[in-house]
Structures are given as C-alpha cells and as structure tokens.
C-alpha cells in the first residue's frame, strides 16, 4: 500500500486524468466486489471524511501504479511530494508481487524507459560496481526492484533543494520528469557530467585545450601552426614564400634571380646575349649584319652562299683593320653586287661552292686595299671616312692677319671636288647685289682707316685691299652674273669697277695702288669737301648690315673704334647663302 496525505490526494484529484482513472477504479471495485482486503475499502471510504486533515490515504500498489502510469501524472506526483515533503511508506511490508507487477506486464527496456521506470540513479551511475551488480540482477526479483524504486523516491525526498529552487523559479520544470535519461533531459536538469559538452559551449567556456581553435580565431591570435597567416599574399608580404620571396617574373627580374638574368630584347641587345648559333653573334639587325659581314650561310630558295663571296666579305671586313693606314677604302662595300657576281660565276641551275683558300684571298685583298686607300691631299673624304682622316685639310683662320700665299692657294683650289662634304643642304649662288653691298661696306671702312692715317697708308692694308680685289675678280669668274641688270632704284651701273667717288686722302693715287679698288668721296653740290674731317663718320656711305649670324658683324660708329675683324673668308659665299642674313639699306 502506498500512503499519501489526504491534502495531497485531494490536490491530485483535481487533475482530470487522475479523477477519471480513480472514478473508473471505484466503479469497478463496487460493481465487482472483488476487494482482496477489507482495509482497502475502508481507506477508500475515508476519502469523503473531512474530520482530520492529517489523515493519510493509502492506495494499493497496483492501483497506485495504474493511476500514475502516465509520465505527466508521475511528474505532478513527484512535484507534489517535493513540495509537501510527505514521507512515503508501505503499510504492509509483505507485498504480493502479483499485485505490484503483473505477470503479463512487459519488462523490456523500451517500456521501462517510456514509463520512466529505469532503475538508474546518479549515485549508481557514478559507482561502476553498483551498476554492474544492478545489471546482473535477476529480472524475476520483483521485490528487489520495487525496493530500489522506492529508495530512489526517498532519495529524491531527502535531497530536494535544487528541485525546490527550480520550481520556485520556473513552474514549467514540474512538467518534465527528472527520470528521463536522454541528452536533452540531462542537459535541462544539469545532469551532464560536466555541463553541456557540445563544441560551441566548450569553446565559449574556454574548455578546449587551448581556447577556440577555428581558423579565424587562430589567425587573429597569430596562433597558426606556421607563424601566422599562410595565404599567398601574407607569405609574400612577409617574404616567407618557400623560394625566398616573391616568385613572379617581375620580382625575379628585379632581383636578377632569373636563370640567365633579364631576358627581354633590350637587355639581350645590350649584353650581347642573343641565342648564338654557328653564324650569329651579337646584334642581328640587317644593318649590323651588313657592317660586320655576318650574313647567314643560307641564301634565298635554300641555296648556299658561295665560299668565294664570303671570302671577299672577309677581305673587305678585316682588310681595313689589318693595314697600317687608318684611312678607309675609296669604294664602299656592296654585298649585293658581290653576291650577284658570285652567282653569275656558277651554273645557272645549280649553286655550288667554289673551292678557295682563305689565306690567299686575304693576302690579295690586303694588298689591294693598301693600294686603293692612299688618298691624295687634294681629294675629299667620303661619308664613311670621317674617322680615318683629318677634319679640315686647310688651316683655320683665327686672326685678321692673313697670309697672302695661303689665301691665294685657298681661292685657287676652291674645293674643285664635287663630292659631298658638308651635311647641310646645297643652296644656290648668292645674288651679285648682296655680295656687292658687303664688299662696298668693307671698302667704306677701309677708306675711313686711310683717312685716319692722314696721308699715311700702312702696307698691310694695301695688301689686304689687293687681296679683296683679287677675290672680286675670282667671284666674277666663278659665278658669271650675265643676267644682272641695272638696278632701277639707283643710278649705279652693273659693273663694280666703275664706282669711283672723289678721294680725300691725296697721297693715294691710282699708280701707287696698282689696280686697287679705291673708294673716295665726292664733294657735295653746295660746297667743297673741306667739311670732312679725319674722324668723320662713315655711316652715310655704307648700308645697315644686320645678320643673325655672329660671324658677320658690321662696324657701327666712327673709324676710331678700330679695325675689327671683318674679312671676307673663302667660305663667305656659304654665309651669304643662308636665310639668316638680312641686309637693309640705311638712308643718308
């Protein structure tokens, strides 16, 4: 018999499931009249008595199990037992096993687990020996199992603190039985061995061997196995790549870590590191091959180049450096002509190599080059002879005092060779009027110098005028201005030698000058020439000459400024041909 206080039993009757089960049980007991013990009916009739509140109601074990088979009812009953703390006891220690556990009741593990009748406690789980003894117990020992069941209930009555606390905090705890052993029930009842054990809870509680172990946490804490982050960008930033730094082509080229250094075309050309074969060395452009004679041995249409042609190329190539003379041959090297010549020597349908001796051809070409490279002094240079001859065969005039013989020689030669010498563009001859104005400007200056000496003419000045007289004659012979007509703006004739003006310095006579072109001044129409002083200005007798070239400077001012450099050199025609010189007449 299971005895419970009347107050607790009345509270349980308020539950619809208990009330319906108890009413069905009472109807069955009254109708069948099969009550084995008269005391049972006495105790059941006492339910309607309200005399004593402390009266205990005892229910047979079979009825108790039948009433509270539902797990929800059992949870309510256990909660009420913990709340009211009533001691449960058996009125009769001798309980018939047939009343408690019928023979027809199933004892499978699933049924016991579903009904919450598994005889497992926390103490028994912690003790391995007790667990083994419990598992080895005989299933037919129903009395022992019942004792263990009620011992568990009594244990929970002795230790109700945690359940009382949970009941006060959360009334829904009463809906769950603590006898359930699934993981969810154990987790809700905090019955797990050391709390919740899934990875997230362990990681939050820092229960992992070394904290959180995911890749993000390890990367943030620099706890990756190989010193920090291991992606390619991080390794490249920290120079931790396996091959000592960044391995892209640009980085290897900057660090000169390529197997053969830098391999682009410019570097190969500067270092001469082209892929060499048996015939190519250094630069491979057509101009380089033509200069060095390193044509490949294969010609057009798969034919082989004649050996004699290559020997001639070698003669042309090495003959210049083997000779003692530093002058180049007089004729340029024409490889195409040599190839055509060698092709004509062979057969028409066949290209065959002609046997030759390189040493004989080299000796022959060397002797021929020595004889051809001797250039006379009067012969001009070719374009490819710049490095093997002097820049100017004639002396450069650096002062005003010209040697008469040198000047005559330069004028007589006048560069008769028609080959190209200067890199500039060839221009046409200057007009005669331009040359005439420049010459008259110079003679005007010379006349001022004559007047300044007061009847004393220095010999070198006379010689200088003679030189320019000769140069005027040479100009007439070279350019032959046969199309020159009289200038309509002036009354000057076309002939230069008829410009005579009245001469002031009387000691100068035509017999003493011997054909020197003299410039004298006429008396003005309203007076004599006595107004002309030795220091008179010559601005009225010469035009303004304003060139942009610094080699042609006109003499401005009086003759007391001295005789500056204004000599007509042999190359004056080159200066006069330029468009930078502008001659403008000045009014008197």
Curated annotation (Swiss-Prot):
Keyword terms: Amidation, Cleavage on pair of basic residues, Neuropeptide, Secreted
Origin superkingdom: Eukaryota
Residue positions, PTM Serine amide: 210, 227, 244
An example Gene Ontology CC term for this record: extracellular region
Organism annotation: Camponotus floridanus (Florida carpenter ant)
Signal peptide start-end: none
One BP term from GO: neuropeptide signaling pathway
Stated name of the protein: Neuropeptide-like 1
Residue numbers bearing the Glutamic acid 1-amide modification: 281
Location of Threonine amide modifications: 194
Localization (cell): Secreted
Residue numbers spanned by region Disordered: 115-143, 342-382
List of residues that carry Tyrosine amide: 260, 318
Propeptide residues according to the Swiss-Prot or TrEMBL record: 1-179, 285-299, 321-588
